[in-house]
Amino acid sequence: MLMTGIAMFGVLDANSKILSAEYSAAQAIFLRHVTLLALLLGLRALWREAGGSLRTRHPFLHGLRAVAMLFSGLLFFLAFRHLPLALGYLVFFTAPFLTLVMAALFLREEVPRAAWIWSGVGFGGVIIALVPQIGGGASLLGLGYALLGTICYATNITINRGLRAEAGLARLIFWPSLLGLIAMAPFAWGAWVPPDAEGWARLTANGVIAGAATLLLALAFRHASPARLAPFEFIALPWSVVLDYVVFGNTPGLAVILGGCVVVLACLMSERAVIAAARRPSRQGTSSGKA
């Protein structure tokens, strides 16, 4: 689920980069939330209570999550207006490390030592790829947008984990969509550009893809800890390079390729180490039982 969600977010960001050349961030994000809300309410009109209840015992967390989602989408839309897709994602790849820190600080989750080590290795891969880009004159404004968007994204993922005890997924779409629609409406109105047929299709697709990707990531982080899943978010690096080349014709430099290899290695080794750590206590318990 995590891998599919990340792939869909890559497609979403590629589509957003195309849209950013013609439409304001406010208009694109507004229509994204309109689409999400319309799909959810339409589904619930056909199947009552589809996705579970909209009520929650944690209104503050849902409100904070909605704000984090809104600013994450808005900031990344602005970032990709100034940056190549792969470069924006290089900044995004600090999210797994931030997620581990937030899970440890706010959720009091025990993070295995192996997860810290291999996420650190993955973060090092990001640095390898990013430093030459900064020295090459990359937009600092775009990088700033991407960094702030990454912090918002990590906050969203951490809150998803904190809300894992709540059954149903409808509220995960409803409240952020409602807030986004209300918050962006006046800004979208002031900067409205009438879309053509292709524009409507792309703007609507943004909402559909965003909703599907959000649900997949929420499900993934409800069924596994950030410590285990966070390193696998780094797989978005090679995926963004592929999209950047296929859609925009941008060829990655040697530093990006090298950094990407380090990141993928960190993903694989982290999973191997976490599985080994999870099995070790059970083996010790079995040995003690036999004794």
PLM features: what roles do these ranges have?
Residues 35-39, 91-105, 120, 178-183, ...:
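Alpha-helical transmembrane segments of compact multi-pass small-molecule transporters, enriched
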Residues 1-4, 50-75, 141-149, 194-212, ...:
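Loop-to-transmembrane-helix transition segments
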Residues 22-71, 152-156, 175-190, 265:
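Transmembrane alpha-helices of multi-pass small-molecule transport proteins
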Residues 17, 25-26, 40, 135-195, ...:
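Transmembrane alpha-helical segments that form core, pore/gating elements
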Residues 131, 238-291:
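C-terminal-most transmembrane helix of multi-pass membrane proteins
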Residues 89-94, 163-179, 214-245:
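Helix-helix packing/entry segments at the starts of transmembrane helices
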Residues 37-57, 124-136, 179-201, 205, ...:
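Membrane-interface helix-cap regions at the ends of transmembrane helices
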Residues 89-92, 108-128, 139-142, 196-197, ...:
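Loop-to-transmembrane alpha-helix entry segments
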